[in-house]
Regions:
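Autoinhibitory propeptides
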Residues: 1-45, 56-66
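Loop/turn elements at helix/coil->beta-strand transitions in domains of secreted/extracellular proteins
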Residues: 2-4, 41-46, 93-97, 158-163
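Residue-level detector of buried hydrophobic side-chain packing
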Residues: 4-5, 50-52, 133, 162
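Acidic glycine-/aspartate-rich tracts in secreted/extracellular proteins
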Residues: 10-12, 51-55, 60, 105, ...
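A generic local secondary-structure boundary/capping motif
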Residues: 31-38, 87-89, 124, 152
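Soluble non-cytosolic domains of exported or imported proteins
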Residues: 38-39, 43, 54, 123-131
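Active-site-surrounding "flap" and adjacent substrate/cofactor-binding loops of secreted or lumenal enzymes
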Residues: 61-92, 97
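Subtilisin-like peptidase catalytic core
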Residues: 100-168
Length: 168
């Protein structure tokens, strides 16, 4: 007996409620009591220890796709960390927002870093979880369409910089 049939569909891992759920809007607008002014994470470096990051996501672009905010690399323009160093496997993938990354999976002694295990050298995300958590915390604002409805999504601190640590 078949009791339920549902259409298969894939839903992108985008969040639109994080900032609202924690009350970030008054901090962003500077209307929070005692706030010296609007604040969206400028001068914060967020480290995410997870499954890596999707380098191609607009959530981690050097320029915010919604308001055009140009991120400032606190290390200095063109200076990056970890596998984004000039001789690293991720050289050329970092930018003023995504300022570095480290690979603790493929770089671990005895680890089987092969395609069959869905791992590759560097801190690229092979399953999406690290990308989702990093964008929830510090992803740029983005205009997206979800279930045919336009939405604007954002990390809690969209103007923060990010260093990704691929640990799983």
């Amino acid at each position: 007996d078949v009791r339920l049939v549902e259409e298969y569909r894939e839903v992108p891992m985008d969040t639109d409620l994080g900032p609202q759920l924690i009350g970030a809007t008054p901090v962003w607008t500077g209307t929070n009591p005692g706030a010296p002014g609007p604040y969206r994470g400028e001068s914060v470096v967020y480290g995410v220890i997870d499954s890596g990051i999707n380098f191609g996501s607009p959530s981690f672009a050097a320029v915010d796709p919604v308001d055009g905010y140009v991120h400032v690399n606190p290390l200095g323009a063109g200076t990056y960390l970890g596998t984004c160093l000039p001789a690293g496997v991720d050289a050329g993938r970092c930018n003023a927002k995504l300022i570095g990354g480290y690979d603790f999976v493929c770089g671990a002694p005895g680890n089987q870093c092969v395609a069959a295990n869905r791992e590759e050298p560097g801190f690229g995300d092979t399953n999406g979880h690290g990308t989702h958590t990093a964008s929830t915390a510090a992803g740029n604002r983005r205009n997206v369409v979800f279930s045919n409805a336009p939405l604007q999504i954002s990390g809690v601190a969209p103007r923060a910089n990010i260093i990704a640590y691929d640990a799983c």
